[in-house]
C-alpha cells in the first residue's frame, strides 16, 4: 500500500466497507476510479494478511505439526 497504509486487517476491512458504500451512491467518475484503486490495494493487503495467518495456523497431529486445512468439511 502506498499512502495511509492500514495498521491492521480490521482497519483495512473497515475502510474497504466504507469505500464500497460510497461507490454504491452517486460519485464523480474520477472519484470512483480513485476509490476503486484504493479498494483494490486494500483487497490485496487483506488477502496477504489472511494468507500469512493461514500459514501460521497449524494443528498438532499424531505425526507432529501439520498445516490446518480451513477448506476441509471435517
From Swiss-Prot:
One of its GO terms (biological process) is DNA catabolic process. GO terms for molecular function: exodeoxyribonuclease VII activity. GO terms for cellular component: cytosol; exodeoxyribonuclease VII complex. Bidirectionally degrades single-stranded DNA into large acid-insoluble oligonucleotides, which are then degraded further into small acid-soluble oligonucleotides. It is an enzyme of class 3 (hydrolase). InterPro entries: Exonuc_VII_S (IPR003761), Exonuc_VII_ssu_sf (IPR037004). It catalyses: Exonucleolytic cleavage in either 5'- to 3'- or 3'- to 5'-direction to yield nucleoside 5'-phosphates. Its main location: cytoplasm. Keywords: Cytoplasm, Exonuclease, Hydrolase, Nuclease. This is Exodeoxyribonuclease 7 small subunit. Pfam families: Exonuc_VII_S (PF02609). Its EC number is 3.1.11.6. Gene3D superfamilies: Exonuclease VII, small subunit.
